[in-house]
Amino acid sequence: MAGSPNEDSEGSRITYVKGDLFACPQTDSLVHCISEDCRMGAGIAVLFKKKFGGVQELLNQQKKSGEVAVLKRDGRYIYYLITKKRASHKPTYENLRKSLEAMKSHCLKNGVTDLSMPRIGCGLDRLQWENVSAIIEEVFEATDIRITVYTL
């Protein structure tokens, strides 16, 4: 069985890389969490806003908590998991799971095989990575989608 030494469990969906998320392969789609108001005023969301813009495009999609907004940039998708109503709120694991399910559907419909993300929901949003990673594993277990998580 092939696997990297950093994988905790056999057959893990998630590979961990220490480095800059934005240096991931151009073929990877990117993922992060935002609120319905698309403020993106703190944390890694600020970098997504600067790099990819499209705030009005995201707002026009009128996505609610538990859904996913999507931008297409340079031949790849940028996924915005909508995990809370307002920027000042905190997300729930349930909304995170629903938005991951919505993203999975989009990935499968559009042939996306590689996702790169930070430890979503675990910075300013204060979710626990052991819970978040378990949800990611469950949501993507019956797919061939590869997930790389970047940490600094």
From Swiss-Prot:
It is found in: Nucleus, Nucleoplasm; Nucleus, Nucleolus; Chromosome. Substrate binds at L21, R119, I120, G121, C122, G123, L124, D125, L152. Subject to competitive inhibition by the product ADP-ribose. Gene3D superfamilies: Leucine Aminopeptidase, subunit E, domain 1 (3.40.220.10). It catalyses: 2''-O-acetyl-ADP-D-ribose + H2O = ADP-D-ribose + acetate + H(+); 5-O-(ADP-D-ribosyl)-L-glutamyl-[protein] + H2O = L-glutamyl-[protein] + ADP-D-ribose + H(+); alpha-NAD(+) + H2O = ADP-D-ribose + nicotinamide + H(+). GO terms for cellular component: nucleolus; nucleoplasm; site of DNA damage. InterPro entries: ADP-ribose_metab_enzymes (IPR050892), Macro_dom (IPR002589), Macro_dom-like (IPR043472). GO terms for molecular function: ADP-ribosyl-[dinitrogen reductase] hydrolase activity; ADP-ribosylglutamate hydrolase activity; O-acetyl-ADP-ribose deacetylase activity; purine nucleoside binding. Its main location: nucleus. Keywords: Acetylation, Chromosome, Hydrolase, Nucleus, Phosphoprotein. Pfam families: Macro. ADP-ribose glycohydrolase that hydrolyzes ADP-ribose and acts on different substrates, such as proteins ADP-ribosylated on glutamate and O-acetyl-ADP-D-ribose. Specifically acts as a glutamate mono-ADP-ribosylhydrolase by mediating the removal of mono-ADP-ribose attached to glutamate residues on proteins. Does not act on poly-ADP-ribosylated proteins: the poly-ADP-ribose chain of poly-ADP-ribosylated glutamate residues must by hydrolyzed into mono-ADP-ribosylated glutamate by PARG to become a substrate for OARD1. This is ADP-ribose glycohydrolase OARD1. It comes from Bos taurus (Bovine).
